[in-house]
Amino acid sequence: FDTEKLLDIARTAAKHGIEMLVMDDGWFGHRNDDSTSLGDWFVNEEKITGGLKYLVDEVNKLGLKFGIWMEPEMISPDSELYKEHPDWAIAVKDRVGTLSRNQYVLDLSRKEVRDCIYDKIHAILSSANIAYVKWDMNRQLTDMGSLMLPADRQGELAHRYVLGVYEMQERLIHDFPDLLLENCSGGGARFDPGMLYYSPQIWCSDDTDAIERLGIQEGTALIYPLSAMGAHV
């Protein structure tokens, strides 16, 4: 896709009363498929010609809000960030890491890792009138080892990792109080009260079949309010 294709979609959406255009995966780094660029959170201006602010402003002129997809917790082996900091990925010392979905998981128990990724997110959100962020997390945690923790404290990593995610999202909603943050994890794998503290809605499921969604949302509604269930057209 490119800027003109996105604006064409936005024009059609505006005619049908849709209120927000969300730009999904593929807008950053050098990403043309799922094998590259997670961690390189800068705009690919070969696709987003004219820059992100121009695109967002043009979408806003059509009466639509603008949203964006990110997967801040992940890193691609084929990324500038991984080439600079291969030790930032979660891994057991002296073992080859497990690659899943062509990506590794960043060690968000480490402050320097959180700060680096957060600064990149902050720069993107500060550059344009972005109303919504879909924070995705698409793979399981494996190879649970941290190069920063001593051997007798490796068991703390999973807990410290989640606390790191919480800290980043706390900063996000503090710095951008009008932002709508939606959590997602391969669908609804993170639909829990901890994440709802930071995001008022969570992506309910990657199954968007209208009939199948009825059962999914009925079951989710036994515990959670309907307003918390995210769904896209």
Predicted regions mapped to residue ranges:
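Glycan-recognition surfaces
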Residues: 76-115, 159-233
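Aromatic-lined carbohydrate-binding/catalytic grooves of carbohydrate-active enzymes
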Residues: 1-118, 132
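Active-site and adjacent substrate-binding regions of carbohydrate-active enzymes
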Residues: 29, 44, 57-61, 112-195, ...
